């Protein structure tokens, strides 16, 4: 019988049986997860084209060639980060749905509202997931990235519909409001309505000076 061993297993076994002390090797799967989390943070700040891979590698404590050995290219790492980001939003909705208790909720509250509340809380505490969504949409001039973003977005919509059991109109409203919240949170404001104070103030600052008649 032929038994196949990977190089990492051989290295760990050799270290365990030798008299020499060596640093414990981190499994490739753990390194991959750590690199994806680091990529979420770095790509959220500077996007696909503005983020050097070696900055992500340094954050995890590995060499840049190792990153390419796992992901192949910076674009593939970016795609993995985007997919993980949307998966984490789906997991957030899972927890909100599981924790929703109609017995203690407000009379008109339901699972969909609980998921919306959880998302609002995430936006206030996790800017990386927010900004990576914007960076993903901004990179959609690349057809491969566009296809990935469409796919993860569509899966999230279907997931929310399954969890909530809400009709199409409410699901549409949920995601429209979510997009509105994303823009507001990115700008650091709480309101985007026409009559809100900061929009009125900005409009006054940009208004042309009055003419001779004072109008």
What spans do the regions from the language model cover?
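Basic, helix-initiating cap at the start of DNA-binding domains
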Residues: 1-46, 50-59, 76
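Helical hydrophobic small-molecule/effector-binding pocket
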Residues: 106-134, 139-144
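Key DNA-contact positions within bacterial/archaeal DNA-binding proteins
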Residues: 65
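Residues in soluble alpha-helical coiled-coils and helical-bundle/repeat scaffolds
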Residues: 72-76, 124, 128, 165
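Hydrophobic/aromatic-rich alpha-helical bundle segments in the mid-to-C-terminal region
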Residues: 143-215
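Residues at secondary-structure transition points
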Residues: 22-26, 30, 72, 76, ...
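Alpha-helical structural segments
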Residues: 34-41, 45, 59, 69, ...
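Secondary-structure edge/capping motif, primarily at the C-terminal ends of alpha-helices
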Residues: 96, 100, 137-140
């Amino acid at each position: 019988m032929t038994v196949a061993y990977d190089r990492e297993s051989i290295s760990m076994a050799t270290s365990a049986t030798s008299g020499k002390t060596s640093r414990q090797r981190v499994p490739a799967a753990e390194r991959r997860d750590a690199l994806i989390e680091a990529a979420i943070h770095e790509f959220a700040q500077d996007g696909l084209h503005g983020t050097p891979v070696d900055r992500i590698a340094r954050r995890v404590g590995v060499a840049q060639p190792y990153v390419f050995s796992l992901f192949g290219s910076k674009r593939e790492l970016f795609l993995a980060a985007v997919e993980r980001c949307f998966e984490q939003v789906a997991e957030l909705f899972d927890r909100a749905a599981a924790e929703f208790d109609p017995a203690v909720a407000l009379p008109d509250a339901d699972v969909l509202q609980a998921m919306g509340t959880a998302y609002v809380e995430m936006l206030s505490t996790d800017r990386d997931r927010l900004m990576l969504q914007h960076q993903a949409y901004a990179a959609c001039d690349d057809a491969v990235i566009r296809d990935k973003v469409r796919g993860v977005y569509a899966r999230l919509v279907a997931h929310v519909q399954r969890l909530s059991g809400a009709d199409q109109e409410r699901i549409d409203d949920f995601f429209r409001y979510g997009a509105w919240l994303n823009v507001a949170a990115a700008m650091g404001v709480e309101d985007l309505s026409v009559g809100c104070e900061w929009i009125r103030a900005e409009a006054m600052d940009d208004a042309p000076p009055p003419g001779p008649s004072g109008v």
